[in-house]
């Protein structure tokens, strides 16, 4: 195929997804490639519109399957995903050829800070990981479900309470002024891959692979690979209470078991056998909490 062809980049149509995909497209065009966006409706978006809690949907890839399918069936050449939404199981015929430079991986409270939250205050979040982490430091807090796009979530801050969001999502849309408190990522360990975008293409598409090599950030790729190795060893999806965050020479991990037992680890990463260390940590953490 011609190297002059237009690279069609599939993405969800939410404001955050559009902005993230547009940044990837801009990087490709700056490098001399022609690019256009292809918007795809996903199961996750449909359930979000219906207000269905994410952890009740079942299955994995609810925000990614339809976007990947657009590439596999030829409607697009590339697929852009929030990396935290991308399952660790590979899809035949596709591979991640770029991890974009990571934004902040932290979570943040919007509304009141932890210190400002009165006893029994309400936190709105759809993430079981965030609920488990906040409950560990404030067992008095109440939790209610929260889904929707960023604008919708910001309209649903409980009276006297807070919502929890990824700092990166607010950065993308220029809304960091709404943050009451950024949470320490060594205690409130972020979701795997939080803060970066994964871009897939077909494994036999040499033009797309070459184009994406200029978008890939090696440091982010290394960090997310370690985090995903931890998650893959657990056999877990994004709807379960798991976090992993690599920064510097440490992989920070969080796991909550079915009985409420919590395991936290800081694994030194010295440059050798790094993926093996992440996998070993996952096995030890799972044994510590007694399984799901």
Regions found by a protein language model. Give the residues of each.
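Small-molecule-sensing regulatory modules
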Residues: 2-41, 47-56, 136, 140-292
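Helix N-cap/beta->alpha junction signal
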Residues: 13, 64, 127-128
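Short, structured active-site "lid" loops
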Residues: 50-78
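Paired acidic/hydrophobic, glycine-rich loop segments that form the ligand-binding mouth/hinge
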Residues: 72, 77-82, 161-166
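A conserved helix-loop-strand patch within extracytoplasmic ligand-binding domains
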Residues: 83-86, 90-141
